[in-house]
């Protein structure tokens, strides 16, 4: 509880449990390490703990994947950075406070107007922009998710995608669709 969650980070209760398990195993070993080393160790621990649970949950619903696609491959290949660069080239990003932001409010407002919503109705939604790259240089989960979906459509050639969303992703869908629109992908 002494560590604050990043504003744009995952805030589910299970993250506290995972952090405690990591601390029980590793202790203070990573306290004095650089942020990347600490991040990589936590990510690897989280994957080894959570992927088997996710597979078991999906199995209960009869869902089986032939291949698991890891977010880390998008970062390692530079595809997240490439996707953010594509959004920037289209004029959909700006820098503020050392971070790179997606013009989410502008994109969603444009889509809502095209769907027949009035400016007054759109104003009531209090749409906000999203951080793609934090001031510390790390890309956000949202940036990686945009890259992942771009990869599905633009690289792997999917024409239909079925997403299984967690209950905490209800606001994510329209924002992700907006990012796909900004990239010229449906």
Where are these regions (language model features)?
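NTP-dependent nucleotidyl-transfer catalytic core
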Residues: 1-186
């Amino acid at each position: 509880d002494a560590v604050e969650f990043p504003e744009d980070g995952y805030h589910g209760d299970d993250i506290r449990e995972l952090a405690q398990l990591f601390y029980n195993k590793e202790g203070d070993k990573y306290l004095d390490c650089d942020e990347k080393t600490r991040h990589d160790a936590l990510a690897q621990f989280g994957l080894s703990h959570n992927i088997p649970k996710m597979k078991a949950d999906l199995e209960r619903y009869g869902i089986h994947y032939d291949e698991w696609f890891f977010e880390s491959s998008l970062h390692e290949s530079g595809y997240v950075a490439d996707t953010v660069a594509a959004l920037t080239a289209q004029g959909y990003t700006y820098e503020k406070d050392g971070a790179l932001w997606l013009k989410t409010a502008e994109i969603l407002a444009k889509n809502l107007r095209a769907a027949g919503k009035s400016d007054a109705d759109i104003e009531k939604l209090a749409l906000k922009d999203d951080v793609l790259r934090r001031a510390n240089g790390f890309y956000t989960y949202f940036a990686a998710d945009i890259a992942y979906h771009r990869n599905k459509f633009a690289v792997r050639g999917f024409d239909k995608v079925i997403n299984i969303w967690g209950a905490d992703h209800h606001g994510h869908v329209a924002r992700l669709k907006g990012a796909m629109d900004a990239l010229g992908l449906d």
